[in-house]
Amino acid sequence: MSAIESVMQEHRVFNPPEGFASQAAIPSMEAYQALCDEAERDYEGFWARHARELLHWTKPFTKVLDQSNAPFYKWFEDGELNASYNCLDRNLQNGNADKVAIVFEADDGSVTRVTYRELHGKVCRFANGLKALGIRKGDRVVIYMPMSVEGVVAMQACARLGATHSVVFGGFSAKSLQERLVDVGAVALITADEQMRGGKALPLKAIADDALALGGCEAVRNVIVYRRTGGKVAWTEGRDRWMEDVSAGQPDTCEAEPVSAEHPLFVLYTSGSTGKPKGVQHSTGGYLLWALMTMKWTFDIKPDDLFWCTADIGWVTGHTYIAYGPLAAGATQVVFEGVPTYPNAGRFWDMIARHKVSIFYTAPTAIRSLIKAAEADEKIHPKQYDLSSLRLLGTVGEPINPEAWMWYYKNIGNERCPIVDTFWQTETGGHMITPLPGATPLVPGSCTLPLPGIMAAIVDETGHDVPNGNGGILVVKRPWPAMIRTIWGDPERFRKSYFPEELGGKLYLAGDGSIRDKDTGYFTIMGRIDDVLNVSGHRMGTMEIESALVSNPLVAEAAVVGRPDDMTGEAICAFVVLKRSRPTGEEAVKIATELRNWVGKEIGPIAKPKDIRFGDNLPKTRSGKIMRRLLRSLAKGEEITQDTSTLENPAILEQLKQAQ
């Protein structure tokens, strides 16, 4: 395999602020290395120590790791615990009962505060109500809800009973919801009348009804509806129930059902490259352990922090760093219903200032769109807001290009907040490669080093290690407690997708291209393996070309894909959003030429995009991820046949199609 070539030359280094390091959970690179050494010396002992110290077990485990049926690994299997008990009851016992657990801000700006005692009561009453409806340990419950306290309550109530939840993002279509209901074998669906996004009401209950009408969901005996807006909804007597009625009159306590550490806490569906979505199955013990460890290590969570992860509970980030991790850590967190651009694009900065957020965790896509908004309107520039409460920033969901990193560092963190650029996946359960804010010298665009206990490596297509400085395929060499256990109902697909025989069947395949710096050993993620371009025999990660484009002062956002080319094998096609209005005609030709030359100067002639198309924005999911598969189809001139139900802005496809 020809090495994936990294053309990013990033030499800026930012050390942890002294005051931060001295108070941090991991205060130095020496402390980081000591933990890595402990894991190398005694891998099972390392994980067992943390599991015993950090979690409450109703039955202590005696066996740490079972590898007898690899790659179907089992951790702490003979131990028993309950995730909801660890998140809620322990906080009632350790003095946090009257501490605020959730500061909920609705789309319209109204704020509700819920203490740990109140949250525990809500969860227990709802869990008792579910039990009264016949929902038991091992049942699967699908949750299709807006961002809300009630969404977290629904997840925690399922965990309390030992019912496996499967949260479906509120932006998914009826067909997508139906597929997940059928695949997971749900016995109940928890939804809402409507959800609010950017001042608009979206009809969740109507979509849920349509999903159930598509058939195959006969096992769903109960549809429980959270009354979010009071909007009118269709009603099926005997099946549909209001959430408040399910909880009404139920006791404030509900015994937490002990489950095996390997009991499925949840199944979360993620897109497959082909075929139906993959139901990623996570365990209870190993998953919860890593959620809590990464809250302590990556976010350095302290008792007086106000933590805000802007994700949706429909994605894994919202599971680990809203519904479970912060509660297990006894933290106070913001939960937000709305969008970053309503009522204007200063919403995030306004909320940080009003609530005095200290740790802020968001996606690079959101940062890039807010850069564009801030530069277009001085009134909503971050400098207009008091962001002095912040002490730590984070990014999640995709690699962050160095220019966006620097803007975030300067304008949001005021050059005093470390940035944890976290690489992880739905399948990994929690962070894998990330800076530690009190220890790691930061390099813009690099997720730096694996967390202690995570044996990440870069290999070629035969599974052999490649030297630092050469690109390759990111893998993890040893199992870890929070890893995916299987694909729900499809163990063979799990084995082929994540432990392919081509790599020897024992390496976890992350599916991303990566490179390690020759000197520091730092990892840079170069995009999905299928986002690697091969132009005239040169293999390049799309992220690097995107970073070069975005570093041009005219460019707000860029996405790069490949298309077949008779001469070069593959040609580079760039979709670009400018900081000003979209150019057309002669002006578009002129700016495209400028940008080609810019990339040639930044990277080299081989990286010049053959095609550049300008749009008002890029096709994105409602969670803000760029839908690159649609861009690939556009670049190739193909008709769009893929599912576009999660697309936030469908009209952009026609605009980009016409832009060629």
Curated annotation (Swiss-Prot):
Cofactor: Mg(2+)
First-tier enzyme category under EC: ligase
Any GO MF annotation of the entry: metal ion binding
EC number of this enzyme: 6.2.1.1
A GO CC term assigned to this protein in UniProt: cytosol
Record's keyword terms, sorted: Acetylation, ATP-binding, Ligase, Magnesium, Metal-binding, Nucleotide-binding
UniProt binding sites for CoA: R197, G198, G199, K200, T317, S536
Name of protein: Acetyl-coenzyme A synthetase
Lineage of the species this protein comes from: Bacteria, Pseudomonadati, Pseudomonadota, Betaproteobacteria, Burkholderiales
Gene field: acsA
